[in-house]
Amino acid sequence: MHVPGTRAKMSSIFAYQSSEVDWCESNFQHSELVAEFYNTFSNVFFLIFGPLMMFLMHPYAQKRTRCFYGVSVLFMLIGLFSMYFHMTLSFLGQLLDEISILWLLASGYSVWLPRCYFPKFVKGNRFYFSCLVTITTIISTFLTFVKPTVNAYALNSIAIHILYIVRTEYKKIRDDDLRHLIAVSVVLWAAALTSWISDRVLCSFWQRIHFYYLHSIWHVLISITFPYGIVTMALVDAKYEMPDKTLKVHYWPRDSWVIGLPYVEIQENDKNC
């Protein structure tokens, strides 16, 4: 008796504009198939920087952790799901977009969070901590389908904890490269967040002056933040997990350029010197 209603509900989550979220950019201005043109195609940077960082960080991943490849794949999935969401403004697209972000942050936690920040009951065991993070993320994922606001609370909680860790580590370090990376990461993230909030809160103003691109600017800035954030976490992790090795920061395409994507090279310390 309930099958037709269930089918209608399932089909509705795939439908165009079935999400309650609608960004400032006018819909279907450039194509009948793409709801938000600039918000959709600005995600292409996720698909560029993801594979590029996998290539640049390959030596690091081979020596430290191959989980880096999984983190990069999740980053690219965020770009794909975000493209799908902004193309359709469907409820399913919204869920996939938000859940993929949650899993990216969770995977970063599992791989790079220093053991000194682990809960005491896991006793510094990264495997147990990763299991705890995975179980929590799975529960949050299922709850998101029941109550979508759960994911927003989860993401905000993680963001607050990350800021706390960044502040704590920044106070402890003396390495100029790491301090620079943390500063740039925070500035990029703050600029991206400002664009995101401004698009939501001041939409009527931006529409009056015909400037609809703040959310697409958020996509570009946050995709650039990813390489800086990854390298920052790798350097912090190395301080705790690889004290016998030195990580040298390089920038693609050239170290001498003012702007570039950071990556690290692991160097063996010569203990005979």
UniProtKB/Swiss-Prot annotation:
Optimum pH is 8.0. Pathway: Lipid metabolism; sphingolipid metabolism. One of its GO terms (biological process) is regulation of lipid metabolic process. Disruption phenotype: Homozygous knockout mice are viable and fertile, with a normal lifespan but display several postnatal skin phenotypes. It includes an increase in total ceramide levels in the dorsal skin, tail epidermis and dermis. This is associated with hair shafts and sebaceous glands abnormalities, cyclic alopecia, a progressive loss of hair follicle stem cells, hyperproliferation, inflammation and abnormal differentiation of the epidermis and results in increased transepidermal water loss and reduction of fat content during aging. The chain crosses the membrane at residues 37-57, 73-93, 94-114, 127-147, 150-167, 178-198, 216-236. Disulfide bonds: none annotated. This is Alkaline ceramidase 1.
